[in-house]
Structure formats: C-alpha cells, structure tokens
C-alpha cells in the first residue's frame, strides 16, 4: 500500500472502528484516494459494491478497510469454529493474493483478526497448518481454496464478507466456474457484504455481480484517459536488426531506477534477459514457468532494489503491486489492446509520474492501430539515429550456463556498464522528428 493524498477525505471521517483507524494511521494512511472516498461510505452502510478503477488507485485498501470494519462490527455466526473463515478475498493470481495479504498486515496487527493464504505452487501442508490454527479472513486463488474446501478443511457457511478482486482478469484466466462454485456454497447474498472490483465493468462482470450480489451500487472512477495522464508515452519504429541495440541504448540513456520490460513470449523474454545480464545490468526474469518460490524471490529483489530491471511476459502485467516503477518498455506491442493499458499501468501509480516506451517493430507494428483506437489517442512517436546506437555490446549469456545466474543477475552495477570496460554512452539515440509543413 502506498501513501497518497489525492482527496481531502480522511479515513477518520467515516466512523471506522478505532482499531482500523489505528492500523491505517500507523502506516501513514490518513487521506483517501478517490475510489476509497467513494466506496467506503457505500460499504460502511452495508450496501454491496461493484467498483471500477484502474490498478494503483487504492482499491485494495478500500476493500480491506471495509472488510476489517465489517468483521469488527458484525458478530460472528453462532457455532462457528475458529477454522471457519468469516471473510474470503479471491484474487486471479498468486502474486496478487500475496500482495493483498501483505497489505492487510497493519490491520491484522491492530485488530487481532487472523488471515491465511491459499494458493497453488506453495506447500499444501504449510498452508493447511496455518488454516487449522484459526482464520478469520481467507485470501487466495480459487483453485487452492476449492482444494481445501473439498478436503473439508473448512466450509463457507459462515462467510460474512466477500471480495472478488480483478474480476475481469478472472474471466480472462477462465476462473469463472470456480468463482460460481464458491459463491453457491456461501450464505445468501443478502446475508453477507459483497465487494467486486474490476478495471472494467464489462457486461459479463456486471452479469456476475447481478447473479451473486445483493443489488450492488456501481462506483466508477474514470481516468482522464485510459493510459493515465501521469504516464509519458513514447513510440519507436525500430527494425528487427536495431531492436535490441535500441533497447540497451535507451536503458543507458534513461538509466531507470526501476523498469519492467514486457515481451510477448517466454523465449523473447529469455533473449532480452541474456543480453542485459551480459551487459552487467541487475536484471530478473519472470515468465510463467518460474516456480512460485523463485517468483517471490525475484519480485522481492525487484521491490527491494537489488534488481533494477524485470523482464516479464504478461503474467506480471496485472495483479502485481510493485511500487515506484519509473519505466515500462514494451519490447513487443501486445496482441491484446487491454494488455497495453495494464502493462504501462505498472508505472505512474498513486500520484507518481512514469515513462512508457514502446517498439512498433516489423513483427508487431500491426497491433498499433487497434491499440491507439482502444486508448483513443495516438502514441507520440520519436525517431532514432542508428549511428547513435551502442555497438560494442557483449554476447548474450546462456540462460542455463550458470545455475547462480539463472533468472536473476544481481551482481551488476548501477554505476558502470560491463564492469567499467565501456565508456558511458554520450550520444543520444533519439533524433528530432522533422516538423510537418503547413
């Protein structure tokens, strides 16, 4: 959770329980973001909500605050065992579930409520032991939650609050049957507080809300533009021959504090990682086949600043809350227009500014018209000077040549490239575009 001061509304203005206010204020959260200011009065009145807001706007804190407050003000059902959750928060990815749990920790400490995680790719027995020690709030992905349910580790008879986060992403990943399976085993919608949040309130998302919620109020925070007004967008048209050199030259010119590079395939991501690691950049690789423990370690290194650049497929485009990402590079333009918005939305979050640089190369330039139509504006274009591109670049590393360097390279330097063997880049690759004649 990131401290923001975007509205004049304070959390203390809403009549929250003192323990909730205490947890928020100890982490420095005093003022609300727009989605928090709109959602909390609705939720605190007991009304269900279907909220639409871009990632990075503070919706996680909105539903966590409402969930904790609801559990504190609503008596637990009579006969409920400590192993039976009172609230359930469903997320589309393991990373998002973990991030929600981490964001909940200040409120767990101040309220005394217990939370547990349930997601695949992690030890079943370890999660089972945590659940058996008592749980008020269950946070996780639908598949593992259903596994525990079918093993009768818990039931859902005493659920008093439900959160469905990134609902549109749930549809994209094919989890809708799992969601309906879980909803049908909970108390009636009128007997629980229901919260749905989504980047888009599409027809299918609204249909889900109508089916499993109690007349939810729609709360929408529309951005001025789909891509966020704090994000500086830039587009290059590199040849396939120049593409990698342009990326490395721009990285050396921009020298980003924290950057994510997106490519469309696992193989392309591995190629980018190999070139940047060879050039002594502190770079991590995040693709779909990375084991969960390694994913968590890579993300922690990136968040802590031990890794400066993360190369990723769209597995990281949504559901990850990584603060202070300064640059996003679209090495490949995505095939899905919405993925462009979600990718560059990793930067320019919570009031910060960001820079997005995209390559319309020979292979993926065909995707550009649809993307620009979707975001309703043309992406500003820059030319580059081929003679200004770096040429003395080392050969790429072999991804599997060294177990120690697989997936992450934290041995690079922020102050020099290639161990100081190459002079710092002096020539700017950008070339001014000629002005159009009237």
Swiss-Prot record:
The gene is rhlB. Residues 394-438 are annotated as: Disordered. Belongs to the DEAD box helicase family. RhlB subfamily. ATP binds at residues 53-60. Component of the RNA degradosome, which is a multiprotein complex involved in RNA processing and mRNA degradation. Signal peptide: none annotated. DEAD-box RNA helicase involved in RNA degradation. Has RNA-dependent ATPase activity and unwinds double-stranded RNA. A motif (Q motif) lies at residues 9-37. One of its GO terms (cellular component) is cytosol. It comes from the Bacteria. One of its GO terms (biological process) is RNA catabolic process. Residues 424-438 have a biased composition (Basic residues). Residues 40-219 form the Helicase ATP-binding domain. This is ATP-dependent RNA helicase RhlB. It is found in: Cytoplasm. Pfam families: DEAD, Helicase_C. It comes from Vibrio cholerae serotype O1 (strain ATCC 39315 / El Tor Inaba N16961). Keywords: ATP-binding, Cytoplasm, Helicase, Hydrolase, Nucleotide-binding, RNA-binding.
